[in-house]
Amino acid sequence: GITRGDEVIVPTLTFIAAVNPLTRYVGAEPIFIGCDDSLCIDPDAVEAFCAGHCELRGGKLYNKTTGAHVKALEVVHVFGNLGDMERLTEIAQKYHLILIEDATEALGTRFTAGKFAGKFAGTVGDIGCYSFNGNKIITTGAGGAVVSNHPDWAEHAKHLSTQAKTD
């Protein structure tokens, strides 16, 4: 659902591989937001950006400066630390943002308290991504995994993983 010209909120502390699929390959523009003490994207800064620099029109969030549709929020869980998914989920719902989790560096990390207690990193948002590159927690040499609570998105990701063949 993210297309050329859309904007995506991303953290400043990340590796470019977490941003490239959204920007370089799809054509969206990144909006870099700072991180909190967890080293994950700061919910207060995300809320301040959405409330102060954007406006909701017709159920969509628009950047007042660029006029672009702000379509998604990407959370990158780093060094085993989890972003504040309770707050970030509320913000994503309030502003109608797709919530993407890059859980590569928190694979196996589980929420221990709150609304998401027992859930694993990457399973809270609309879509979760994991890399299995040679320098990651679990390696396969290359590749990764995508999980989603949207069956049609999961099916589309599966289609793309086979070089988008239709036979």
Regions of interest found by a model, annotated:
Residues I2-V78, L82-K94, I98-A106, R110:
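PLP-dependent aminotransferase-like
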